[in-house]
Amino acid sequence: MSSYFVNSLFSKYKTGESLRPNYYDCGFAQDLGGRPTVVYGPSSGGSFQHPSQIQEFYHGPSSLSTAPYQQNPCAVACHGDPGNFYGYDPLQRQSLFGAQDPDLVQYADCKLAAASGLGEEAEGSEQSPSPTQLFPWMRPQAAAGRRRGRQTYSRYQTLELEKEFLFNPYLTRKRRIEVSHALGLTERQVKIWFQNRRMKWKKENNKDKFPSSKCEQEELEKQKLERAPEAADEGDAQKGDKK
């Protein structure tokens, strides 16, 4: 209430008239901390204790303005005990907030938002799992016993290899490199072809050993040609007997 209203209210009544002096007396039952008792009424000489002093008892020094002003004494409710001035014990109020987490008290909305965000992320991860990255070592490896595809040679490559085989059934490393480069093959492919060709020659001539020199090979070819007419005559004789 403004000071003008208070002054006009008190000017209508004199000391001791119609209103008892005890009506405005309000004192604390206990004097805690050696603080003076707050008394309102005509006996106090028109002065009373500033509310900032009462606030200092609970919250320490006040940063509010301490300019003197007058206040209606009826606006202040006195219950006898300064500890119950606000209706509850300040010590209990402090212990109530001290028992909780200060972060939850100050940032309750943030905590709840963060918790809800984490819950949504967990649900999203369960519904749509992220694709796993496949590393080279995680891919299925080829079977150890798997055979490679059979190499096919063109007519030109086969003709050139046959010529080289008739000239020399065994190739040196240098000659093998030259043949492989000329035919567009690898050294391993040329080597395997010559091995297979020698095995084929042994089966055709019924020999356990392939001739190591060219002279031996020529002699074997001559013997084969000599045996050819004899084999033809024997075949004709067998056909005549059957008839």
From Swiss-Prot:
DNA-binding region: 146-205
Region described as Disordered: 203-243
Motif Antp-type hexapeptide mapped to chain: 134-139
Compartment list: Nucleus
PANTHER family attached to this UniProt entry: HOMEOBOX DOMAIN-CONTAINING PROTEIN, HOMEOBOX PROTEIN HOX-B8
SUBUNIT field: Forms a DNA-binding heterodimer with transcription factor PBX1.
Cited function: Sequence-specific transcription factor which is part of a developmental regulatory system that provides cells with specific positional identities on the anterior-posterior axis.
Record's protein name: Homeobox protein Hox-B8
Organism encoding this protein: Homo sapiens (Human)
Gene that this sequence comes from: HOXB8
